[in-house]
Structure formats: C-alpha cells, structure tokens
C-alpha cells in the first residue's frame, strides 16, 4: 500500500474514533441540558477542565510511550517492549490523586473551578463518580495509542466508537428511565473507557501483535523518555482546559452564569472540532515515526504536507456548516429557550471557530514535530497555543472588546502560534 493510501486509512479511522470520544461529551451536554437546564450546562463546563487534565496525562503517557515504541521498533531495538507496561503503571500512579479527590473533596474541587453554591450542590455526585474512574480514562488513551501504533488502527477506531455509543445510549437510560440524574450521566461516561479497553485488548492475543506486557516496576527513566515525546500531547489536551478555565472566569465576571452556559455550548462543539484535527495528527503519527525511524525524511515531509492540506480543507468545511446553521446548532443545547444565552452563543460560535483555520495546522505540525523526535519545538508550539498566547490574548482582548474579545482570543492566539510554528518547521526543514 502506498504511503498516501496508508495516510488516509490511518487518519480517517482515527478521526472517526476521536469523534466518537467527543460525542460522549456532547451526549452528556445534551441530556444534562434537558435534565438541569443552563445550570447543568454550566456545571459540565466547569468540569471540562478536569476532564482535559485527565485526558492530557493519558495523552502524554500514551502518545509519548507509543511514539517512542514505534521509533525503536522501526530501528529493531528490543527496548521498545518495556514502554507499554511502564505507561500503564504510571497511569495508575497519576490517577491516585484524582481518585482521592473524588472520595474526599469533590465539592472543594468544584469551588476551585469557579462553581457557586448552586453549581457545587448540583455537581458533587457527578464529579465524584467520574473522578473515581480516572485510571480507566488514562489507560484507555494508552491502550488505544499502542494498538494504533502496532498497525491496527481499525480496532482502535471500533473500540472507541463502541465505547462512545455505550455512553450515548446509557446516558439516556441512567438519567431518565432509571432516574439517576447527573450521577447517571457520570456513570455512563465513566464506564465507556472500560468497554473500549476490553475491545482493544483483543489485539494483544493476535499473532501479529508486537506489544507485550512486561513484569517490571515503574521506571522514572522510561517515563521521562516517554514524556519527552508526549509533552506536546499533554499541552495540546491541556490547552482546552486552560482556555475553558480562563474563559469561564472572564465570562463569569462579564455576564454571569448565562455567559458560562453559552460558552459551554461553544466549548462542546469545539471539542468535536479539536477531535477532528487531533484525528489527523494522531492518525499520521505512527507513519511519521516509522519514516523517521527508517531515516525516510522525504516520506515524513510528505505526510506533513498531506496533514496540513487535510487540516485546511476540514477547517473550511467545518466553518461553512457552522456559519450556515449557527442558530439550530446553538438551539440543541438551549432547552430553556433562553434568548440571552442563544445571543451569546450565536456570536461566540461565529467568532471562535475562525481559529480552526490556524489551529488545525498547529495541531498537525505539533504532532509531526513530536513524531520525528523534536520535542522542544513540539512543546513550543503547544505551549504557545495552549497557554501563553491564549491567556495573553484573552486578557487583552476582553479588556478592549468585552465578550466579543473573549471569543476573538482563540483565533488571535492560533494565528500567532501558526507564525511561530512555520518558523520552527522551516528552521530545520
């Protein structure tokens, strides 16, 4: 199979898989909006940064270890076998604080995220359940990354889609027929990665599998080597959490809970958009790492060009759909028919999503830099878009233009990052 055909196979399957992951957040938002109105949407938006932090750690461990594994395997290095078990062990270590927070102090965590008394009272049960399932969220990221890098992207896609479908169906069953409310939504979301891991585990019984569990203690050295390549994935996932936290605080100050609920609508659709571009980057990563391990620089550059072109085309298609149907798209999560929330979300969607013309390229380029063992440049791109530029732009533009300035911070920061990314790519290429 030609490199181009492999690229489209890996990328398309990975996009579908990650779209499935983002869809269970959308399902949560929809059912919670039906059950609890704008307060429920505001609660979920306050919880999104916690989800992002959990996924970020899973991404750093999974993508970093799997990338290191793919490079070493392409070079015939037997040390590649140790990275899978090590990543799983460290996931259990990193998950422990989240589990303890879920048991002992979920209300403290919700207050820290900006929740008022109403939101905290509403969300304690929801937060407690999903925090207790943190190990499964992290390990799911690791298992799917290794299955994908071991030449089985189809199974990784099927596992993710099945987990997401379970979440959507049981969100409804747990919340309404069974009457569990918000804790039911959390339970459906929490069990979803358990099912995905079980399906992915089939890969390890195939004769073609080269991924093995190795009896070992957690190795700080292997962790550092993995995180070196996974830190851009960590920052990339965290960028959503940082953006959500900063925007929540600014919007609370500017217009209160209704503005936060409006941003909840924007943020949930943004999760879907980001999943699409992460699908391009993560789908190309095994092929780029394989080319790099075999010293095929031309192949790696070809994949970068394919990824950048794909990202631009997808951004244009995404914005065209959003611009044409902004009203109905916003109305899906506006169960109370709040005119003010609809007004805020309508303008927010149209301004915010301009950023994906730049963000798609930045995500693909950061994935490429990590896949070819250039972690410093990958981290610089991810840090710029995820923390430095977005925080600076949101503070400055909100002071100048109010709520529209908050929405404009995302496209402005991504445009700045795109300039930095082009400089980093051209410096060595």
Pin down the residues of each PLM region.
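Helix-loop interface residues and adjacent transmembrane-helix termini in multi-pass membrane transporters
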Residues: 26, 35-38, 72, 149-150, ...
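Membrane-helix interface/capping residues of multi-pass secondary transporters
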Residues: 29, 38-41, 153, 182, ...
């Amino acid at each position: 199979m030609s490199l181009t055909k492999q690229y489209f196979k890996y990328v398309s399957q990975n996009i579908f898989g990650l779209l499935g992951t983002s869809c269970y957040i959308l399902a949560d938002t929809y059912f919670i909006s039906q059950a609890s109105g704008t307060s429920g949407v505001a609660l979920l938006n306050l919880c999104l940064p916690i989800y992002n932090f959990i996924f970020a750690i899973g991404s750093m461990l999974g993508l970093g270890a799997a990338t290191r594994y793919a490079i070493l395997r392409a070079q015939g290095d037997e040390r590649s076998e140790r990275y899978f078990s090590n990543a799983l062990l460290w996931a259990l270590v990193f998950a422990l604080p989240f589990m303890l927070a879920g048991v002992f102090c979920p209300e403290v965590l919700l207050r820290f995220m900006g929740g008022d008394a109403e939101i905290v009272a509403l969300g304690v049960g929801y937060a407690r359940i999903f925090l207790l399932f943190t190990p499964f969220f992290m390990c799911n990221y690791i298992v799917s990354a290794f299955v994908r890098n071991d030449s089985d992207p189809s199974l990784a896609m099927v596992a993710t889609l099945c987990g997401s479908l379970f979440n959507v169906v049981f969100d409804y069953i747990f919340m309404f027929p069974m009457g569990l409310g918000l804790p039911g939504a959390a339970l459906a979301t929490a069990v979803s990665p358990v099912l995905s891991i079980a399906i992915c585990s089939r890969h390890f019984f195939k004769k073609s599998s080269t991924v093995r569990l190795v009896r070992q203690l957690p190795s700080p050295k292997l962790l550092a080597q993995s995180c070196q390549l996974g830190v851009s994935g960590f920052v990339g996932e965290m960028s959503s959490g940082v953006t959500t936290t900063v925007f929540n605080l600014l919007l609370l100050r500017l217009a209160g809970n209704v503005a936060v609920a409006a941003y909840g609508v924007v943020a949930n659709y943004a999760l879907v958009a980001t999943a699409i571009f992460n699908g391009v980057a993560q789908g190309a990563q095994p092929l780029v790492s394989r080319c790099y391990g075999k010293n095929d620089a031309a192949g790696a550059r070809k994949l970068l060009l394919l990824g950048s072109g794909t990202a631009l085309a997808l951004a244009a298609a995404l914005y065209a759909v959003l611009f044409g149907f902004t009203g109905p798209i916003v109305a899906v999560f506006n169960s109370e028919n709040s005119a003010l929330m609809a007004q805020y979300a309508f303008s927010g969607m149209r301004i915010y999503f301009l950023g994906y013309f730049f963000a798609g390229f930045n995500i693909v380029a950061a994935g490429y830099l990590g896949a070819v063992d250039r972690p410093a440049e990958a981290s610089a791109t991810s840090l710029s878009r995820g923390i430095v530029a977005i925080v600076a732009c949101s503070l400055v533009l909100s002071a100048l233009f109010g709520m529209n300035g908050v929405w404009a911070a995302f496209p402005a920061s991504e445009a700045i990052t795109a300039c930095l990314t082009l400089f980093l790519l051209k410096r060595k290429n």
